């Protein structure tokens, strides 16, 4: 049933899956965390409201999240080839996986930060806290 070649193929498949998942998750958080913070800050109830920036980021996230992954995979093939050098394989799959994960992470960060009570943020502002301090510590 499971000969040596089959076990090696399964081990390679497990390694490739872990590699793609971990690397794309890392880059998804690297992109999604600042995206979520920017969404929270520029919201109309945020610390630095900016309707134009918020709308642009919001539209990008909503559009990216609504595109099925297979279509996203095909649509970003030229970008993948530009960044990785080829459009197939486990390393090339990281690009569309990251682009699919980042908006999800950004939206989760935004919703988590919006749960911070407004009174706590107002208290920090009244004590002279800067925006960066509020984002990091409050």
Predicted regions: what is each one?
Residues 12, 16-20, 65, 69-104:
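Loop-to-helix entry region at the N-terminal start of transmembrane alpha-helices
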Residues 38-75, 97, 107-111, 115:
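Cytoplasmic-entry segments and transmembrane alpha-helices of multi-pass inner-membrane transporters
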Residues 1-8, 45-53, 133-137:
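Short, membrane-interfacial amphipathic segments enriched in basic
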Residues 10-41:
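Transmembrane alpha-helix signature in integral membrane proteins
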Residues 32, 68, 128:
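Conserved G/P- and acidic residue-centered "switch" motifs that form tight phosphate/ATP-binding loops
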Residues 51, 89-138:
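Membrane-cytosol interface at the C-terminal ends of specific transmembrane alpha-helices
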Residues 10, 14, 18, 56, ...:
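Hydrophobic alpha-helical elements at and bordering transmembrane segments
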Residues 1-2, 35-45, 80-82:
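Structural signal for alpha-helical transmembrane segments and their membrane-water exit/capping regions
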């Amino acid at each position: 049933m499971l000969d040596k070649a089959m076990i090696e193929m399964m081990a390679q498949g497990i390694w490739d899956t872990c590699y793609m998942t971990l690397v794309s998750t890392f880059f998804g958080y690297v992109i999604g965390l600042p995206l979520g913070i920017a969404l929270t800050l520029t919201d109309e109830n945020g610390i630095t409201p900016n309707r134009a920036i918020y709308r642009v980021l919001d539209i990008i996230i909503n559009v990216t999240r609504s595109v099925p992954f297979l279509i996203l995979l095909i649509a970003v093939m030229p970008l993948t080839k530009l960044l990785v050098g080829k459009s197939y394989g486990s390393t090339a799959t990281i690009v569309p996986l990251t682009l699919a994960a980042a908006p999800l992470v950004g939206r989760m960060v935004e919703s988590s930060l919006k749960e911070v009570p407004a009174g706590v943020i107002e208290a920090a502002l009244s004590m002279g806290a800067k925006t960066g301090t509020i984002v990091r510590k409050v």
